[in-house]
């Protein structure tokens, strides 16, 4: 009974295209996210017994409350998941369900793609389980619609079993996490909790309270275009300047060469002509000192190039995006200790590792609500090879219920 609607709920959610748009200036960045909140999630939240369900058009958050039914459980706990999906085709998502996976390749629909344990050895962790995959033409959207489905399913179970005692619960579904702005307008006053959890992690047991600190870097290169036949000592090729800048960054400090606590510079876009070019980077690191050092390094490279050129032709724009939430959460580890205790009671081994990325919790933690991250089940996220285990989603439901009953 507890999980009866979990799979159908998840399938219903992922079939709705809620891809965010990094070039949009609205909140949410796409109309589909607001429509998803208002036409699908809000009525369902009300139907399963959440109270004071309301949508804030300013920040795109849909929030509901389940009051405590035991006054001795005095903590207030929040659960957060994001509605948007990543920068990959999300139109006409057509999930396929693999019952009792027995190993080997999984052909993704009628496409030429397959999930191969040689390429994706994480498949070997799911023998005997029910897997939900893509058809090879879209992403799945388990990031983070598995989290939404898990929260909804846990709330539905609690309201259907009033004899199960629980604390005050707040639920929030927000926009635009994948483009890094989802929590920018989050209203703490509308989410009065002692701490919260984002249900936005990956495999079973993930419990995370360390994220990258993140910055966006835009570098503009100003060239001077003249006819190539008479270009000697006159032309300044902006594209060559961009290449020169990139080559001055440490070659091994890129995503494909780093893991664990190692930071990186990641070139995400390069456009231009001889006259003008533009390079987009993201900068990531865990430690505050090394994060700041990376930003200083790019500034110094630009200054050095400009000095050599004799004029300012390399223009740097740096914007911090979010910070490592460890700095906030380690001051009070209650949320982590509670989650560890609940997982261990459920025979789930907590896997406490840094997130090589960020969550909405990164920003919300710095707003005053410690918000670590818990597994939601997704694997190979952000692309056609994404999949999720139904059994892992069920365990996430168990963790949510355990947290609010133990508070």
UniProtKB/Swiss-Prot annotation:
GO biological process, one term: proteolysis
Keywords (A to Z) from UniProt: Aminopeptidase, Cytoplasm, Hydrolase, Metal-binding, Metalloprotease, Protease, Zinc
SUPFAM superfamilies in alphabetical order: Bacterial exopeptidase dimerisation domain, Zn-dependent exopeptidases
EC number: 3.4.11.4
Source organism, top-level taxon: Bacteria
Cofactor: Zn(2+)
Cofactor note: Binds 2 Zn(2+) ions per subunit.
Binding site for Zn(2+) 2: 143, 178, 382
Residues annotated for Zn(2+) 1 binding in this entry: 82, 143, 200
Compartments it resides in: Cytoplasm
Cellular component GO terms held in the UniProt record: cytosol
Cited Pfam families: M20_dimer, Peptidase_M20
GO molecular function, one term: zinc ion binding
Catalytic site positions: 84, 177 (proton acceptor)
Family membership: Belongs to the peptidase M20B family.
Function according to Swiss-Prot or TrEMBL: Cleaves the N-terminal amino acid of tripeptides.
NCBIfam families the UniProt entry points to: peptidase-T, PRK05469.1, PRK13381.1
Protein name as annotated: Peptidase T
Organism: Streptococcus pyogenes serotype M28 (strain MGAS6180)
């Amino acid at each position: 009974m507890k999980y009866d609607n979990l799979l159908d709920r998840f399938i219903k959610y992922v079939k709705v295209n809620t891809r965010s748009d990094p070039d949009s200036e609205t909140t949410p960045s796409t109309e589909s996210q607001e429509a998803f909140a208002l036409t699908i999630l809000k009525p369902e939240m009300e139907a399963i017994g959440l109270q004071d369900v309301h949508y804030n058009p300013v920040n795109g958050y849909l929030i509901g409350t389940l009051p405590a039914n035991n006054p001795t459980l005095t903590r207030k706990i929040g659960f957060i998941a994001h509605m948007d999906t990543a920068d990959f085709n999300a139109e006409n998502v057509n999930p396929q369900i693999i019952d009792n996976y027995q190993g080997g390749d999984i052909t993704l629909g009628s496409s030429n793609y397959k999930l191969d344990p040689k390429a994706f050895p994480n498949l070997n962790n799911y023998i005997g389980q029910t897997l939900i995959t893509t058809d090879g033409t879209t992403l799945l959207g388990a990031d983070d619609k598995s989290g939404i489905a898990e929260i909804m399913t846990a709330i539905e179970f609690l309201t259907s079993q009033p004899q199960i005692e629980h604390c005050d619960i707040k639920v929030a579904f927000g926009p635009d996490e994948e483009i890094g702005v989802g929590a920018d307008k989050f209203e703490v006053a509308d989410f009065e909790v002692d701490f919260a959890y984002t249900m936005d992690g990956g495999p079973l047991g993930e419990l995370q309270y360390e994220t990258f600190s993140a910055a966006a870097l835009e570098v503009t290169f100003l060239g001077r275009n003249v006819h190539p036949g008479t270009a000697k000592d006159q032309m300044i090729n902006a594209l060559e300047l961009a290449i020169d800048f990139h080559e001055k960054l440490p070659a091994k400090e890129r995503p494909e060469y780093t893991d664990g606590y190692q930071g990186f510079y990641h070139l995400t876009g390069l456009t231009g002509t001889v006259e003008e070019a533009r390079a987009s980077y993201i900068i990531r690191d865990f430690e505050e000192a090394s994060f700041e050092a990376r930003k200083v390094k790019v500034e110094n490279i630009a200054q050095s190039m400009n000095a050599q050129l004799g004029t300012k032709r390399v223009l740097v724009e740096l914007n911090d995006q979010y910070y490592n939430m460890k700095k906030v959460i380690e001051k009070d580890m209650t949320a982590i200790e509670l989650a560890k205790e609940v997982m261990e009671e459920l025979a789930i081994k907590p896997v406490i590792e840094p997130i090589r990325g960020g969550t909405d919790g990164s920003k919300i933690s710095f707003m005053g609500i410690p918000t670590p991250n818990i597994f939601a089940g997704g694997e190979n996220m952000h692309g056609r090879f994404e999949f999720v285990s139904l059994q892992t989603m069920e365990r996430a439901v168990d963790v949510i219920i355990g947290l609010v009953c133990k508070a």
